[in-house]
């Protein structure tokens, strides 16, 4: 949404995989099941380049894969295009990937370690939608500043450019709970509620990651869903419910 992500995006690919799994679950379509397995393998290989997979036949962009594998990427890539890999951290894409069982335990631990310096930078345990922030000193700034329909919103630390979206934090918490981690969702929930009047939660569109001020529109249902997801991720039976939703296992 007005952010310069192009090519094969992590978010779109995991949504497609989820749709195929649900299609197979509903219609018992064996071809869809095989297609889903092929796509699952391609996502796991291509979006987390490693030296051990450098000759894997499923690689889509060999040069970009090799370059990113040598950089020791600690999380899933955001997108793959003819230019190479976009290695911004995409919270929404990671949330869906974790929910669908696309990351190993080792990779999950790497993702959490990657988030720790982000939490220190932000000053609290809240997860920006995309990271790192693009500033006017970065080469991506030119693409970002012209990429809007009516008014420019992606100032540093705002909107998708480092803004903290409750809905995506909720989804990420669900992904963490599927991996057996309820501590992170609990910590995120407490950090978020410190910024809110718990008797009258703002449910703003996003929170600026530099000032921790509520921004954008308020009283949004999808921001409220983030709170629902966070609470569900802490409950002990959330994992069984999610298995039914995602058809992961």
Label the predicted regions.
Residues 1-2, 77-80, 148-157:
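Short glycine/proline-rich turn/loop motifs
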Residues 117-121, 139-142, 150, 154, ...:
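Non-catalytic C-terminal accessory modules of carbohydrate-active enzymes
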């Amino acid at each position: 949404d007005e952010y310069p992500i192009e090519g094969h995006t992590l978010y779109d690919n995991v949504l497609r995989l989820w749709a195929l799994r649900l299609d197979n679950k509903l219609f018992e379509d064996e071809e869809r099941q095989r297609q889903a397995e092929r796509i699952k393998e391609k996502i796991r290989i291509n979006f987390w380049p490693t030296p051990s997979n450098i000759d894997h036949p499923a690689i889509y962009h060999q040069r970009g894969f090799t370059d990113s594998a040598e950089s020791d990427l600690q999380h899933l890539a955001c997108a793959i295009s003819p230019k190479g890999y976009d290695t911004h951290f995409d919270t929404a894409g990671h949330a869906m990937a974790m929910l669908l069982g696309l990351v190993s335990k080792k990779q999950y631990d790497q993702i959490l370690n990657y988030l720790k310096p982000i939490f220190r930078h932000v000053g609290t345990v809240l997860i920006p939608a995309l990271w790192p922030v693009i500033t006017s000193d970065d080469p991506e700034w030119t693409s970002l500043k012209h990429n809007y329909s009516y008014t420019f919103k992606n100032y540093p630390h705002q909107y998708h450019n480092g803004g903290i979206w409750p809905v995506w934090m909720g989804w990420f918490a669900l992904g963490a709970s599927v991996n057996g981690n309820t501590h992170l969702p609990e910590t995120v929930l407490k950090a978020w509620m410190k910024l809110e009047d718990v008797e009258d939660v703002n449910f703003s569109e996003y929170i600026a990651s530099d000032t921790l001020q509520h921004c954008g529109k308020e009283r949004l249902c999808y921001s409220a869903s983030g709170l629902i997801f966070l609470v569900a991720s802490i409950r002990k039976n959330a994992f069984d419910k999610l298995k039914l939703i995602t058809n992961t296992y």
